[in-house]
C-alpha cells in the first residue's frame, strides 16, 4: 500500500501558492484494508475514504471508461493492480496529473511541471473529451491562473467536444457550479474568453455570447463593444472583491442590448426592461440562487436610472427606493449600488473615478427611512389614503435632504 498526494496540492505547491486541501491516492490497497486501518467509506460511485484523524479524502487508484453521454456516463475500475500512472492518466490537465510520495519526490509522467513553467493548460490524454465539465474547468482555471494559455491541441479538442454536443448534456446545476466558481476567481473575463474561443459560450450562455460585436455610443462607452464592456464590469467586480450575487448581476446587466434593431444602433433605447427579462430567464434556466437572480434582475432593470441620480426629482428617487424594496432590504440595495458602481467603472478611464451616485442614493434612503410610517397611519382617518400619505412624506423628506445639501 503506497500513498501519494495528487492534483491541485502538488500544482499549487510548485507554483508557490498556498495549499488549501490535499487529495490523496492510495495504490495497492482494497476497501477492506482501508476500513481495517480506521478509514471511513464515503464514496458512492468509487472507493473514497476519510482519514480517521485528519478527515481528508483518500481515494483508491482507479481508471474510468466512458459508457454514455454527458459527465455521468462512466464505468469505474478500482483495484490494487491499478498503477499511479494509470490513475493520473484519467485526470484532465497535465498540471493536475502530478503526484508526490511520502518523501516529497515528484512523480510527473505527463510533463505537468514543464507545462507549469511554460504556463500552458494541456490535456493529459484523449480521455479528456469524455467529460464535458472539463471544458468549463479549463476556462475556470484560466480565470484563476494569470498568464496561462490553452494549448492549441487542447483548444481544438474542446471545440470538437462542443461540436459533438457533449456540452449540451451538462445539467444546469453543474454549469452553474463551474460558472459561479469562475466568477469568484481573480479575472473572470478570462473564463469567458476561453469559452468563446472553443465556441462553448454560445451553447452555455448564448445571451452573453451575443453581446460581443454589439456597438454602444462611443461618447459614453469608449470601448464601444458591449461584450468587452461587460467583461470589464465583471473584472472590476472581481478586483473590488464583490460577492457572487454582484458579479452575476454585472454579467447579465446589459443582455437586452443584443436585441436592439440594427437601424437603431449604437443606441439602445429601453434596453433595461429587456435586460431584466433575460437576466431572470438565464438565472432560472441555470438554477442560480434566488439572491443572485433577484439582484441580476434589479441591476438590469434599474442601472440606467441609478446612474442619473444627480438629475432625478425626489419623487422619482422615492419610487425607485420603493419598487426595489430598499426600505425593507437595505443590505440588498447596498449590493445593487455596488453593482451599479462596477458598471460605471467598467469603461476606459473610469476605474479610479468616484461613483458619487451611490452616496446620493444612500442619503436618500436614509431620509426616506426617517419617515415614521406608523405615526402617519395612526393619525390618518382615511385608511385607504395611508400609502399615498406615507409616499408623500418620503418625497418631502428627500426634498428636505436635497435642500440641506444645497445649503
Swiss-Prot record:
Per the UniProt record, which EC number(s) apply here? Answer: 2.7.7.72, 3.1.3.-, 3.1.4.-
Q: What does the entry list as the binding residues for Mg(2+)?
A: 21, 23
Coiled-coil stretches are none
Q: Name one Pfam family in it.
A: HD
Provide the alphabetized UniProt keywords.
Answer: ATP-binding, Hydrolase, Magnesium, Metal-binding, Multifunctional enzyme, Nickel, Nucleotide-binding, Nucleotidyltransferase, RNA repair, RNA-binding, Transferase, tRNA processing
| MF GO annotations | ATP binding; CCA tRNA nucleotidyltransferase activity; cyclic-nucleotide phosphodiesterase activity; magnesium ion binding; phosphatase activity; tRNA binding
HD domain boundaries? 226-327
| Positions annotated to bind ATP | 8, 11, 91, 137, 140
The cofactor remark states: Magnesium is required for nucleotidyltransferase activity. Nickel for phosphatase activity.
Cofactor(s) this protein requires:
Mg(2+); Ni(2+)
Q: Name one GO biological process term.
A: tRNA 3'-terminal CCA addition
Q: What else is known?
A: A single active site specifically recognizes both ATP and CTP and is responsible for their addition.
Describe the task this protein carries out: Catalyzes the addition and repair of the essential 3'-terminal CCA sequence in tRNAs without using a nucleic acid template. Adds these three nucleotides in the order of C, C, and A to the tRNA nucleotide-73, using CTP and ATP as substrates and producing inorganic pyrophosphate. tRNA 3'-terminal CCA addition is required both for tRNA processing and repair. Also involved in tRNA surveillance by mediating tandem CCA addition to generate a CCACCA at the 3' terminus of unstable tRNAs. While stable tRNAs receive only 3'-terminal CCA, unstable tRNAs are marked with CCACCA and rapidly degraded.
NCBIfam families assigned to the protein according to its UniProt record, in alphabetical order: PRK10885.1 (NF008137)
Which HAMAP family does the UniProt record give? CCA_bact_type1, CCA_bact_type2
Family, as annotated: Belongs to the tRNA nucleotidyltransferase/poly(A) polymerase family. Bacterial CCA-adding enzyme type 1 subfamily.
Describe its partners and assembly state: Monomer. Can also form homodimers and oligomers.
Name of the molecule in the record:
Multifunctional CCA protein
This chain's source organism reads Aromatoleum aromaticum (strain DSM 19018 / LMG 30748 / EbN1) (Azoarcus sp. (strain EbN1))
Q: Which gene encodes it?
A: cca
Amino acid at each position: 500500500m503506497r500513498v501519494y498526494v495528487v492534483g491541485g496540492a502538488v500544482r499549487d505547491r510548485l507554483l508557490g501558492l498556498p495549499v488549501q486541501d490535499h487529495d490523496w491516492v492510495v495504490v495497492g490497497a482494497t476497501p477492506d484494508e482501508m476500513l481495517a486501518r480506521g478509514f471511513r467509506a464515503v464514496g458512492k460511485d468509487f472507493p473514497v475514504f476519510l482519514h480517521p484523524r485528519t478527515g481528508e479524502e483518500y481515494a483508491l487508484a482507479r481508471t474510468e471508461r466512458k459508457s454514455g453521454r454527458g459527465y455521468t456516463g462512466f464505468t469505474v475500475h478500482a483495484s490494487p493492480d491499478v498503477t499511479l500512472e494509470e490513475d493520473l492518466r484519467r485526470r484532465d490537465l497535465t498540471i493536475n496529473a502530478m503526484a508526490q510520495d511520502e518523501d516529497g519526490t515528484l512523480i510527473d509522467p505527463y510533463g505537468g511541471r514543464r507545462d507549469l513553467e511554460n504556463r500552458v493548460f494541456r490535456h493529459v490524454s484523449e480521455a479528456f473529451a469524455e467529460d464535458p465539465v472539463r471544458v468549463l474547468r479549463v476556462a475556470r482555471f484560466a480565470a484563476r491562473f494569470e498568464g496561462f494559455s490553452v494549448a492549441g491541441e487542447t483548444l481544438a479538442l474542446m471545440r470538437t467536444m462542443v461540436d459533438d454536443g457533449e456540452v449540451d448534456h451538462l445539467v444546469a446545476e453543474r454549469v452553474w457550479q463551474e460558472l459561479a466558481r469562475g466568477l469568484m476567481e481573480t479575472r473572470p473575463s478570462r473564463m469567458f474568453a476561453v469559452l468563446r474561443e472553443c465556441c462553448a459560450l454560445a451553447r452555455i450562455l448564448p445571451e452573453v455570447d451575443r453581446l460581443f460585436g454589439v456597438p454602444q455610443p462611443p461618447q459614453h462607452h469608449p470601448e464601444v463593444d458591449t461584450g468587452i464592456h461587460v467583461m470589464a464590469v465583471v473584472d472590476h467586480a472581481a478586483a473590488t472583491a464583490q460577492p457572487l450575487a454582484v458579479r452575476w448581476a454585472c454579467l447579465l446587466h446589459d443582455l437586452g442590448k443584443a436585441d436592439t434593431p440594427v437601424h437603431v444602433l449604437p443606441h439602445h433605447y429601453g434596453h433595461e426592461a429587456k435586460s431584466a427579462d433575460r437576466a431572470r430567464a438565464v438565472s432560472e434556466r441555470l438554477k442560480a440562487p434566488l439572491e443572485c437572480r433577484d439582484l441580476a434582475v434589479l441591476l438590469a432593470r434599474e442601472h440606467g436610472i441609478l446612474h442619473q441620480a444627480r438629475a432625478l426629482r425626489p419623487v422619482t428617487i422615492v419610487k425607485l427606493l420603493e419598487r426595489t424594496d430598499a426600505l425593507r432590504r437595505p443590505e440588498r440595495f447596498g449590493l445593487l449600488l455596488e453593482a451599479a458602481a462596477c458598471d460605471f467603472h467598467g469603461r476606459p478611464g473610469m476605474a479610479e473615478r468616484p461613483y458619487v451616485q451611490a452616496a446620493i442614493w444612500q442619503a436618500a434612503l436614509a431620509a426616506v427611512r426617517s419617515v415614521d410610517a406608523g405615526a402617519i397611519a395612526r393619525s390618518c382617518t382615511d385608511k385607504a389614503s395611508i400609502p399615498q400619505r406615507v409616499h408623500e412624506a418620503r418625497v418631502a423628506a428627500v426634498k428636505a435632504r436635497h435642500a440641506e445639501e444645497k445649503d
